[in-house]
Amino acid sequence: VLNPGSSWIENISSFGQNGTRQILLESSTIPQLGLQKRLSYLLSYPYGCLEQTVSAAFAQLYLDKWVQLNPQQEKQRIKHIQSAIQQINRFQLPSGGFSYWPGNYQFDEWISSYTGQFLIEAKMAGFLVPSMMLKKWEKFQIKLVKGISLNAVWASSEVTQMNQAYRLYTLALSGKPEKGAMNQMRELKSIYSPAANRLAGAYAVTGNKETGNRLLTGKNKKATSIGKTATYGSDIRDRAQMLETYIQLGNPQKSGELAALLSKEFSSGNWHSTHATACVLLALSKYLGEQKAGAPAAFKFQARETKGTWMEVQHTQPIGFTQIQDFVGKQKIRIQNTGKSKLFLQLIQSGKESLGEVKASASGIELSTHFFTAEGLELDPAEIPQGIDFQAEIRVKHTGENPYSYKDLGLTQVFPSGWEIINERMNDFSLNQNNDFDFMDLKDDQTSYFFSLAEGQAKKFTVKLNATFSGKYYFPAATVTDMYHVPIHAQTTGKWISVARAKTN
């Protein structure tokens, strides 16, 4: 924290491989959120399910309202959102709903509502959204809303309540409110808090703020882990969606309290899923975008690149980023607050670790990679003759130390550039119907699997390879993580391998 007229000196050392290093100075007139770290996490997330595609774009939708973006950054923001809208089309089913993975035939209730909310708000923000995509989605939502009957089973189901309330909210947002279903749900004797919140938002959007406020002040049931797991949720996700509702209800006191709470949690550095991260950034964007602008941030800094001179920086939005030139070794950075506002500063360094620095780790799951010849004999990958076909067998196992199933695991193995993957996916029907995974993503040099594991269950995934190019190569670590529960993870070590040149006659 730097008061007006104060200075700050920081000694930093270079980090990461050449060509991967980046140093940013995040300056803010509001308490730090760790915004750059959160955005980088969303934008660099390696998988491409619909939730993660939408989350990366949704978090940027209102970014220009509270973050100082240069022309290039603004161009990138717009391009990313437009690209996401185009990609979403691959996930829409004939029913109008959306699947979690492209090519899947089962719609996901929560993600269908989440995607619809993004498309509606993107359209409101001036982005071109295909009208047919929205019309099909609206019909799908209305059909599901009308298909719910208020029987005893439904009335007590947390997951069904949450999905129904989110559908009602998104339809209201789209200008197609199902008021009869809204009133029926409001009259339930017992309603879970996240569902009551989304229903209150539906009433707020349709102009009935009084009913919305009553829903939030009622004795609602607390959300459980069952509801959170089924809707990719968490406590912070639910608070973020509640902040959206209080903004819509015009309650500045509650909005301010929740915004402060979310900001504090985000600045802690704790891990949050892509969905939770996007929901928080979306809610804070809406809150901060409505606040009156204070005094602009103004400071000057000295670094190695300035060669002893001071570089002046100003931004009128609450948050700004200043790129510091890459360097090798150590350097001293001096910053002086020349403005009238208190400054919250953070230096952010990023870069890929040097080869060989990745260490094995595991929590709740075991991971290993084994190699075999085409005849099934075990093979040492340290040195493989050029030209031979062989296979990698990646094994994962639920250790059983956690008494529940892992539902959203993502496993990735990148292979050395001297090896080539033999792609049999297109001509092997069994691969596309494999019950061991929900989705497989095969690229030139890597393969990713997305699957679930029951308690104590083990699975193995086989990749056929060819030792194509002679030479020495780095074999990166394999990783497996639970995409919505980060303590569940495992990583192997990276190592050097070689492909021995084939002998010529």
Where in this protein do the model-derived segments appear?
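Extended, solvent-exposed functional surface patches
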Residues: 1-158, 164-165, 319-369
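Long, domain-scale non-catalytic interaction/scaffolding regions in large secretory-pathway
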Residues: 1-23, 154-505
